[in-house]
């Protein structure tokens, strides 16, 4: 995933992977997004929610991984090349 610069704003690419109900709501298993450098996981979730009301409902119940590590604080900044996994609650046993 490459970094690009537009004007004075530095933009970065991040990947988003959707699982289970999030995949169904998003209509895709993954996407790559170009975002402003310095956006947080919470900013990304807000943006995804604003684009798709069905996905917004699912995202309220999800947990997130950033490059395979649990996100405990949505104020965590994103960096070029990060991959965010969107994980709805799973049932199992």
Predicted features along the sequence, with ranges:
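Ubiquitin-like/PB1-type beta-grasp interaction modules and other compact soluble beta-rich domains
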Residues: 1-92
């Amino acid at each position: 995933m490459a970094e690009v610069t537009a004007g004075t704003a530095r933009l970065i690419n991040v990947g988003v992977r959707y699982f289970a109900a999030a995949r169904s709501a998003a209509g895709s298993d993954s996407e790559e997004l170009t975002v402003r450098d310095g956006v947080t996981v919470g900013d990304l979730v807000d943006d995804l929610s604003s684009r798709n009301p069905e996905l917004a409902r699912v995202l309220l119940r999800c947990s997130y991984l950033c490059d395979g590590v649990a996100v405990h604080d949505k104020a965590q900044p994103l960096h070029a090349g990060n991959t965010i996994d969107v994980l709805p609650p799973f049932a199992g046993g």
